[in-house]
Amino acid sequence: QGGWPRPGPEIPP
């Protein structure tokens, strides 16, 4: 999560 619109690992910023 974080800057990603779906749950999972925040690999993309």
From Swiss-Prot:
The organism's place on the tree of life at top rank: Eukaryota
Tissues expressed in: Expressed by the venom gland.
Keywords for the protein's UniProt record, in alphabetical order: Hypotensive agent, Metalloenzyme inhibitor, Metalloprotease inhibitor, Protease inhibitor, Pyrrolidone carboxylic acid, Secreted, Toxin
MF annotations from Gene Ontology: peptidase inhibitor activity; toxin activity
Residues with Pyrrolidone carboxylic acid modification: Q1
Disulfide bonds: none
Cellular location(s): Secreted
GO cellular component: extracellular region
GO biological process: regulation of blood pressure
Biological role: This peptide both inhibits the activity of the angiotensin-converting enzyme (ACE) and enhances the action of bradykinin by inhibiting the peptidases that inactivate it. It acts as an indirect hypotensive agent.
UniProt family annotation: Belongs to the bradykinin-potentiating peptide family.
Protein name, entry field: Bradykinin-potentiating peptide 13a
Species in which this protein is naturally found: Bothrops alternatus
